Design a protein with these regions (language model features):
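Conserved GTPase G-domain substructure that encodes guanine base recognition and part of the catalytic core
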Residues: 1-139
Length: 139
């Protein structure tokens, strides 16, 4: 595989951009409130141990369950998009498991089960709970 696609999902202000910047050294805008609109991307290029060039496509998505409420169609489209094209999907949540996060997990599960046009079958899904902007912040 010459291209690995990694996507991050989660509610607005859950630390999605911050996580991608930390993990991959990207420079997505990160602050409280809405920063990302739609899907932003960054490509990382590197050589593997055999000297072959590889790429990682990093996708930073707009927050779902936004306070600037749209209908749930937007959330479904973002989730289905991520599931259809990604090898790895990271789901961020600021805080403990709650009702909105449960809805996100249900959306992801539905997307995996119901998507027949998926670019890849069965992406790897990771859920990150208690994502804090400052690891020393206990709130």
């Amino acid at each position: 595989m010459d291209l690995l696609i990694v996507c991050v999902l989660g509610p607005q202000s859950s630390g999605k951009s911050l996580l991608m910047n930390y993990l991959f050294g990207t420079s997505f805008l990160s602050s409280s409130g809405r920063c990302t609109k739609g899907v932003y991307s960054s490509i990382l290029r590197f050589k593997d141990k055999d000297g072959n060039f590889k790429r990682i496509l990093i996708l930073d998505t707009e927050g779902i369950q936004s306070s600037e409420a749209r209908d749930t169609t937007f959330d479904k489209r973002i989730v289905y998009f991520a599931i259809c094209i990604s090898h790895v999907v990271l789901i961020c949540n600021k805080g403990e498991m709650n009702a909105p996060m449960s809805e996100t997990i249900k959306l992801v599960a539905d997307a995996i089960v119901n998507t027949s046009m998926s670019f890849l079958k069965n992406p790897t899904i990771y859920v990150i709970l208690n994502m804090l902007a400052n690891p020393n912040d206990k709130t």
